[in-house]
Regions:
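Fe-S-dependent hydro-lyases/dehydratases of central metabolism
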Residues: 1-375
Length: 375
C-alpha cells in the first residue's frame, strides 16, 4: 500500500518518482540478443551441476518467446523461389545457433522458440503471443480457489517492443541483463515515470496512413521532450484508429524518445483479437477485466490526471515523410520537392547527372531520381 501511494503521489506531482520494482508477466527475445541469454542459462546449469545441485532447477520462471527474425539476409532476389533459396542459405550459415536454440526449447521450461521464416517478433507478439489479460497458471489461485487474473505485460530485448502497446499491452525494450533477470523471475527496477497524455480527436483524412500519424507523433513529442516518460493515448479519436494502426504508432516509440506509447482497450482491440484467432472466452475476459479496471476507452468518462496533456486532431495529420537523417524531421509530402531542393543547396550538391543502362535502355539520372522508403 505504501509503495502504491508513493507511485500515485509521484504521478500526480508530474515528477519522476523513486525506484520501484516491476515484474513483467513474460519476456520477448529476438535471436541476436536472445541467444546470449540462453547461453547464460546453459552456463548456470553447468555451474549448478559442478556445485552438486540439480541443473534442471535453472529455468525461466515466466513465459519466454524467442523469435528468429534477425538473421535473414536477402542474398537472392527478383526471381521465383528466392525465399526458399535465402532460407537454405540462412540455415547453412546459422546451423550451430539454431541447433542450440532447439536444444534450449527442449531443455528449459517456459520457453518457446519460433523458427526463421515465420515473421517479425513484434508482429508475432501482437498476433499470437499477447493475451492482453492473463490468468494465473494451474495451482496458483486466489483465497477462494479461483484463478488470479492480471494484465499481460512484458519486456523485450528489442527497442520496438512497445509495438504491443497498440493493443493495450504494457511493455518496453530492455537490455539483456534485465531481460535475463525478468525471465528468472526477478523484478527489474525502474523509476516511476512522468505520464504524458495525448488526447486524440477527429478522424484521419483519406490517404493518410498510420505512419503519417507516427511521424507527426515523432515531431510533436520530440519538441516536448518525453525521454523516460510513459505516453498514454486517450480521447474520442482513439476509436478512429484500428488496432493495427495503433500498433504502427506504438512501434515508433523509440523514435519519439519515450518508454512506451500505450493505447487503452476498446471494441477495436476486441475486433483484432477475434481476427487473429483468440477464443471467445479470452475476448470476453479481456473486455470484462478492462472495464472492471477502468482500462476501457470511454471518451465520456471523467478525465484522468496526467503530468501534461498534448492535443492532436487526427484530421490535421498530412501525408508525410521524414529526413534526410532524423525521423522527427517531418516534411509534408506536398513540400517534399521544395525541401529536397533546399537540402541539396544546403549541402552544396550540384546538378550532376549520371547515365545508366537498364535492359538496353539509356537513362539520365539526377539527384532525387531514386527514392528508397524504409517501412
Amino acid at each position: 500500500q505504501a509503495m502504491a501511494e508513493r507511485i500515485v503521489t509521484a504521478g500526480l506531482a508530474g515528477q519522476t518518482g523513486e525506484e520501484v520494482e516491476f515484474s513483467p508477466a513474460r519476456v520477448l527475445f529476438q535471436d541476436f540478443t536472445g541467444v546470449p541469454v540462453f547461453v547464460d542459462f546453459a552456463v548456470m546449469r553447468e555451474a549448478c551441476a559442478d556445485l552438486g545441485g540439480d541443473p534442471k532447477k535453472i529455468n525461466p520462471q515466466v513465459p519466454c518467446d524467442l523469435v528468429i527474425d534477425h538473421s535473414v539476409i536477402a542474398d537472392v532476389a527478383g526471381c521465383d523461389g528466392c525465399m526458399d533459396e535465402n532460407m537454405k542459405l540462412e540455415f547453412k550459415r546459422n546451423g550451430e545457433r539454431y541447433d542450440f536454440l532447439k536444444w534450449a526449447q527442449e531443455s528449459f521450461e517456459n520457453v518457446r522458440i519460433v523458427p526463421p521464416g515465420q515473421g517479425i517478433c513484434h508482429q508475432l507478439n501482437i498476433e499470437k503471443f499477447a493475451s492482453v489479460v492473463m490468468e494465473s497458471p494451474a495451482g496458483l489461485t486466489g483465497a477462494d480457489g479461483t484463478p488470479v487474473v492480471y494484465f499481460d505485460t512484458l519486456v523485450g530485448t528489442d527497442s520496438h517492443t512497445p509495438t504491443a502497446n497498440g493493443i493495450g499491452v504494457l511493455g518496453w525494450g530492455v537490455g539483456g541483463i534485465e531481460a535475463e533477470a525478468a525471465a528468472l523471475g526477478q523484478p527489474i527496477t525502474t523509476l516511476v515515470p512522468r505520464v504524458i497524455g495525448v488526447r486524440l480527436t477527429g478522424d484521419l483524412s483519406e490517404g493518410v496512413s498510420a505512419m503519417d500519424v507516427s511521424l507527426t507523433f515523432a515531431q510533436m513529442l520530440r519538441e516536448r521532450g518525453v525521454v523516460g516518460c510513459f505516453v498514454e493515448c486517450f480521447g474520442p479519436g482513439v476509436a478512429a484508429l484500428s488496432a493495427t494502426q495503433r500498433a504502427c504508432i506504438s512501434n515508433m516509440t523509440p523514435e519519439y524518445g519515450c518508454t512506451c506509447t500505450l493505447f487503452p482497450v476498446d471494441d477495436r482491440t476486441l475486433d483484432y483479437l477475434r481476427l487473429t484467432g483468440r477464443s471467445a472466452e479470452q475476448v470476453a475476459l479481456v473486455e470484462a477485466y478492462a472495464k472492471a479496471q477502468g482500462y476501457w476507452n470511454d471518451p465520456e468518462a471523467a478525465p484522468r490526471t496526467y503530468a501534461e496533456v498534448i492535443e492532436l486532431d487526427l484530421s490535421t495529420v498530412q501525408p508525410s515523410l521524414a529526413g534526410p537523417s532524423r525521423p522527427h524531421d517531418r516534411i509534408p509530402l506536398a513540400k517534399a520537392s521544395e525541401r529536397f531542393r533546399a537540402i541539396c543547396a544546403e549541402r552544396g550538391l550540384d546538378d550532376a547527372t549520371v547515365h545508366v543502362e537498364v535492359d538496353g535502355e539509356d537513362y539520365e539520372l539526377t539527384h532525387g531520381a531514386i527514392a528508397i522508403a524504409a517501412v
